[in-house]
Amino acid sequence: MRYIVSPQLVLQVGKGQEVERALYLTPYDYIDEKSPIYYFLRSHLNIQQPEIVKRHILLTLRMTQLKGYLGNLLDIKDDIIIYSHKNNLEYSYVDNTIFNPFVYTQKKTLLKNDSFLYNVYSGACDFLVIWVARACDTSIPEFGSYEDVDNNIIKFETMLMEVFPQLDLDITVESKFNNIFRTNLKLTGLKKIIQRVQDLDINYKSLLSRYDEHFINMTGNHFILNDEQLNLSIWDLDGTLALSSDGDTVMINNVKLFTDLVSDIDTQMERIKGDITYKVHLATPINSRIKLDIETSFIFIETATNNILLSSDKKISIILAKNHISIKVKNHIPNIEKYFTFLVIAINAMFNSVQKSADFTKVETVYWSRICQNTKNKNRKPIIINYLDPGMKKISNNFYRSDEKEVFINDNGIMFTCMDPLGKYNKVGFLNIFHDMRKYCIPCCFLHDQSHRSTFSSCVHQIDVEKKIVSPYILNFGKVVTESKMSFLPIIFDAFLNDGMTANMEQDNKRLKETSGYHIVRCCAGDDIVRLRTTSDIIQFVNEDKNILIVNDMVYFPMNASDIGKKIHILIQEIVHEVMIVKKKESSDKIDFFPPNYKLLKDLFPKQTIQTPIQSDAGMVLTTDGFYIDGKLFNEDLSSKYVTFTKNVIASDAVAKYFSPLFKYVISEAKDRFIKTWMINIMIHMNVDPNNIIPTLEKYYPNSGRAQIN
């Protein structure tokens, strides 16, 4: 989609606030009659022909810089006051009502502000209207001031307008999976959003639920235990959760959908606060190693890393790559990611030509990562030599070896060798990270021979290796595990699942040396990342995935014992990972993975595993394994437009007392959550009568914990 830079409007007003000049600022050569700015001009101000000015107000300016720019734009040498009818600019009242210098009141405290334009003017990327008045024409002339224009701003703007026609602003924006915001979105706003979804008739599945103090929610044919008393959920057409809100926190996976839904309705919420990361794909490559040739601190701040920029307020970080840009924003600002992408593309056109791909190891651009740098006692960085020693044995077309040294020759004919003065790091190998990402063979010096490594085989012998080589190093539990890594289980589950199993580690590190079988944590289950934020998400995932899930010190089972699959998942930082058995021989780096011993956890499941009918009528049968119609399990998704609320559903004392012995087998401190999750579903499914609750439970759930669990 091609990004269109929105026009801007500057209105100079006189003593009666009548419009003396209306400047339509645009980098294009025409008026966009479909733009909100032109509609505002024509419909609200009755101005049909404004002055078209080929200029652009940078949204990254501070108020003082903006004031100097506007004085220059309008050629005003007097003190001025700037304001807007939509947002407060340099002045605001303590209660945040809109400031107007012509209707000033002393009953409210007035605050002066010198923040950045895109921060104080919500929606400035799409609709910016600034009113300018001479201070002497207002009721508060003492509040006016004059600011000199920053010539660097004018110089940059001039260059921007010159390169603008050649800019390729064809971009595609996607938001980072599962962004979480803070806001004050309450019941009224949530209801308006759900109504908007239904009015649009876009076939998105939506659900608005309200919970009692025990968090019981009933909708369609499934029951959800949730830690939120109020929840809005909307799913994309492919069934992916697009956004979810509990009234205080908004989880947004599809930012475009969210902004479209709330763009023209009053949801009675303040500006959303929280982190969000955008990935912007570019149609035309840029140079990621950006260099600014003039002073541009009013736009970006350069960092020590040449492909990372910061916004002037240091709250937005921009990471550049050849074909995409990643932008991390502290607070949600509509379309700021597109605007900053526009500025980056423009700066590339001004100061940076796109470089052709070059070998990492050309002499003029020698680069090694931090893991291959020399330190006090380690000399890991290879050196460049000009010739081969006589008598060196040719191992391949690009690798030679003798008793004293090894030499690698890259594609540019540059020779690398390792000559550690301490006589330790003299074996040439290659950095896995660059080879895995880009197939770059970056030499590094190692303690031991590297010829058995897969990366060595690829770089020296051109033998293809698997793309997803797993490192034999086992990480401590707690961090998200990538495809090429694995980690230990939490201590309690490591001891339980690996009882009787051993893993031999190399001395002084966590590198796996050999094992005939050991439970570890592998990367995310399946091809897609699955993130579970709430207890409701966890329960829904377990029942749909039909496998065991470990969350902190709790084990979640599917509601139906017969559904329990042969996988074990574990949640790390809200991301679903897999528990697997790893096997490795000491003589090889090859790592093999096998399914876990799921029966160790499955045998802890306390529910009756034999399907028993509870109630039947007219071909419909409710059993301990689900609801059947004419012998077929009923699992259809019912309409989410109709919501049923339950009030004051509680777990009775008799139920809690009956199952209390079971808790000694439950690895959890959250026993109340455990019994509510389980028992409430039992009561609802069985329509339990309080008068005969004990006999009913004994009939269908005899293993209450009084008998030993095997």
Curated annotation (Swiss-Prot):
UniProt keyword list: Activator, DNA-binding, Late protein, Transcription, Transcription regulation, Virion
GO biological process: positive regulation of DNA-templated transcription
Keyword Transcription appears in the UniProt entry: yes
InterPro entries xref list: Poxvirus_early-TF_lsu
A GO cellular-component term linked to this record: virion component
Record has Transcription regulation as a keyword: yes
Domain of life: Viruses
A GO molecular function held by the record: DNA binding
Main location: virion
Assembly, per entry: Heterodimer of a 70 kDa and a 82 kDa subunit. Part of the early transcription complex composed of ETF, RAP94/OPG109, and the DNA-directed RNA polymerase.
Sequence similarity: Belongs to the poxviridae VETF large subunit family.
The protein's role, per its UniProt record: Acts with RNA polymerase to initiate transcription from early gene promoters. Is recruited by the RPO-associated protein of 94 kDa RAP94/OPG109 to form the early transcription complex, which also contains the core RNA polymerase. ETF heterodimer binds to early gene promoters.
Protein name (Swiss-Prot/TrEMBL): Early transcription factor 82 kDa subunit
Organism name: Vaccinia virus (strain Tian Tan) (VACV)
Gene name as annotated: OPG133
